[in-house]
Structures are given as structure tokens and as C-alpha cells.
Amino acid sequence: MAKKSMIEREKKRAKLVEKYSAKREALLEEFRTTESPLEKLEIHRQIQQLPRNSAPNRRRNRCWVTGRPRGVYRDFGLSRNVLREWAHEGLLPGVVKSSW
């Protein structure tokens, strides 16, 4: 089980990403289309003024059951350990153990 503080920190990051996503995307689009180096410098400064945790690449996928940060399957949002347990118990519809 992950520390509660780490799980809460990830939730806070998710909220910040949601809050600033439109502004960040608008600034990045303006940065891509602008030709003037001075304007690009100003836009870059504005992007840097945004909160650091509002960048989407600061987020970490976590298991929604245990909060484990590594070994998380995107399709289920579960860590490999929980996925294995639940699959063996038949709690994941359509998931079967492979054999050949």
C-alpha cells in the first residue's frame, strides 16, 4: 500500500493538470506558431510561471486499489499484483489465464 500522502499528492496533481490544461495548451500552440524570438521568449516565460505540477508529464499512473506506482496496467488501472489476484478470483470479466 502506498503512503496516503503520495496518493493525495497525485490527486492534487491531477486537479492542477485539469485546471491549467487549457491555458497551457493555448500558450504552447502560440509558442509553436510564433516566429519572433522575443515573443517566443515571453511565451516561454509565461509557461514557466504556471505551477510545476500542472504539467501532465509530472503525473504518475497508480493502482486505484493499492496506490502502487509501478507495474500498473493501463487498461485496468490495477497493479500487476492486484490484477493477478482478481483474475484468479474471477473478478475481472473476460480475463482468462492463458495456456497453449
Swiss-Prot record:
<comment type="similarity">
    <text>Belongs to the universal ribosomal protein uS14 family.</text>
</comment>
<dbReference type="GO" id="GO:0006412">
    <property type="term" value="P:translation"/>
</dbReference>
<dbReference type="GO" id="GO:0015935">
    <property type="term" value="C:small ribosomal subunit"/>
</dbReference>
<keyword id="KW-0694">RNA-binding</keyword>
<protein>
    <recommendedName>
        <fullName>Small ribosomal subunit protein uS14</fullName>
    </recommendedName>
</protein>
<dbReference type="GO" id="GO:0005737">
    <property type="term" value="C:cytoplasm"/>
</dbReference>
<dbReference type="GO" id="GO:0003735">
    <property type="term" value="F:structural constituent of ribosome"/>
</dbReference>
<keyword id="KW-0689">Ribosomal protein</keyword>
<dbReference type="GO" id="GO:0019843">
    <property type="term" value="F:rRNA binding"/>
</dbReference>
<comment type="subunit">
    <text>Part of the 30S ribosomal subunit. Contacts proteins S3 and S10.</text>
</comment>
<keyword id="KW-0699">rRNA-binding</keyword>
<dbReference type="InterPro" id="IPR018271">
    <property type="entry name" value="Ribosomal_uS14_CS"/>
</dbReference>
<dbReference type="InterPro" id="IPR001209">
    <property type="entry name" value="Ribosomal_uS14"/>
</dbReference>
<dbReference type="InterPro" id="IPR023036">
    <property type="entry name" value="Ribosomal_uS14_bac/plastid"/>
</dbReference>
<comment type="function">
    <text>Binds 16S rRNA, required for the assembly of 30S particles and may also be responsible for determining the conformation of the 16S rRNA at the A site.</text>
</comment>
<keyword id="KW-0687">Ribonucleoprotein</keyword>
<dbReference type="Pfam" id="PF00253">
    <property type="entry name" value="Ribosomal_S14"/>
</dbReference>
